Amino acid sequence: MKVYLVGGAVRDRLLGIPVQEQDWVVVGATPEELLKRKYRQVGRDFPVFLHPETKEEYALARTERKSAPGYYGFICDFSESVTLEEDLARRDLTINAMAMDEQGNLIDPYQGQRDLEEKLLRHVSPAFAEDPVRVLRVARFASRFHHLGFKIANETRLLMYSMVKQGELAHLIPERVWQEWQKSLQEKNPEQFILSLRSCDALRVVLPEINSLFGVPNPHQYHQEIDTGIHSLMALRASSELSEEPLVRFAALVHDLGKASTPIQDWPKHHGHEEEGTKLIRALCARLRIPNDYRDLAVTVARAHLNIHRVCELRPNTIVKLLEQVDAFRRPQLFHKILIACQADAESCGKTVVYRQTQLWNEILSECVKVTPQTFIVQGYEGKAIKEAMHQSRVACVERIMTSWKSNEK
């Protein structure tokens, strides 16, 4: 029985970046042997075990053979005779197909170290095409390592394109699409996930709602970048500079989703795209089973972003109603996320923007939350009268703030 460190831990060690988790491959052993050594089996489809002390994952070396279309269409062999090289051969990219023995010696049968040095994301073998999830994984690694200068190898991009044309991506299950997309939203360059999928025509299949934004014009006076798809990616890029939260980044990306569904004869104007966008976001989230907190924030940003931008043009009563509608008084942290997504939208319009709306909205909210029910209860207000009195008191707060704000602007 021999044990090897494999995959991402080896890759990240060679890159000199922090190792998040360690995975191990066991060669020349059986499940029974590991169980005798107090390892705990957790793998359902193939034997994966947790170390009795470190709780790190140890998997028996295995091979995979395609037996049917899709993610689950594989026959696995995890017998004692499977070699380390055979196990590494089934992996997606050469940079993920390296191992280290217990003495720290590198085992690199597929030139992963060379591709690390050349900053290339290259598939290990033609077997890459047997698993459609690998297209998504390559796009995710592109988003993770873009800041280090990594590119997808031309031959790998061509293979991904071929997989799309052959219809292999039709077998992707919704959970895996979202799993890879969500992971990419946590990377340094989440926009590269979308760009990588688009470069091999996979975006059209996997995320048609986003793909349809490319080629949709925007009014030039607001968007120097013109194209709605490009603007959406710029908003995603801007949001990743402002926040590490994937919820905010997702909301920034899909805030203009409705623009592709507005009447073509009205372009580049997009009247009503806010409400149209909320429908598309709900449908997208239902299709990919995206969590409700992502959906709810994205829907709110899509619906409210124009009014958030135009705060100085709104009546005080409208401002208070908006804050009530987005539940800002009870959930100010949620409103903060909305503001970040809106700021990302404003900063992605192809010109230098100082988004003072954030300061103004925060000032308004901080004053309005000081209005509490107790003030009116002691005055004898009851039921709906309390709510109405609070609303009017908040409107008065906004009037004072807006008057002061506008006088300072002169």
From Swiss-Prot:
What family is this protein classified in? Answer: Belongs to the tRNA nucleotidyltransferase/poly(A) polymerase family. Bacterial CCA-adding enzyme type 1 subfamily.
The miscellaneous remark of the record is: A single active site specifically recognizes both ATP and CTP and is responsible for their addition.
Signal peptide (residue range): none
Q: Which residues form the HD domain?
A: 228-329
Which of UniProt's keywords are assigned here? ATP-binding, Hydrolase, Magnesium, Metal-binding, Multifunctional enzyme, Nickel, Nucleotide-binding, Nucleotidyltransferase, RNA repair, RNA-binding, Transferase, tRNA processing
Q: Its encoding gene is what?
A: cca
Q: What is this protein called?
A: Multifunctional CCA protein
Q: Which reaction does it catalyse?
A: a tRNA precursor + 2 CTP + ATP = a tRNA with a 3' CCA end + 3 diphosphate; a tRNA with a 3' CCA end + 2 CTP + ATP = a tRNA with a 3' CCACCA end + 3 diphosphate
Q: Which InterPro entries match?
A: CCA_bact (IPR012006), HD/PDEase_dom (IPR003607), HD_domain (IPR006674), NT_sf (IPR043519), PolA_pol_head_dom (IPR002646), PolyA_RNA-bd (IPR032828), tRNA_CCA-adding_enzyme (IPR050124)
What EC number(s) has UniProt assigned to this enzyme? 2.7.7.72, 3.1.3.-, 3.1.4.-
Q: How is the cofactor bound?
A: Magnesium is required for nucleotidyltransferase activity. Nickel for phosphatase activity.
The UniProt annotation places Mg(2+) binding at: 21, 23
Keyword Transmembrane included in the entry's annotation = no
Amino acids binding ATP: 8, 11, 91, 137, 140
Which NCBIfam families does this chain map to?
PRK10885.1
Is Nucleotidyltransferase set as a keyword in this record? Answer: yes
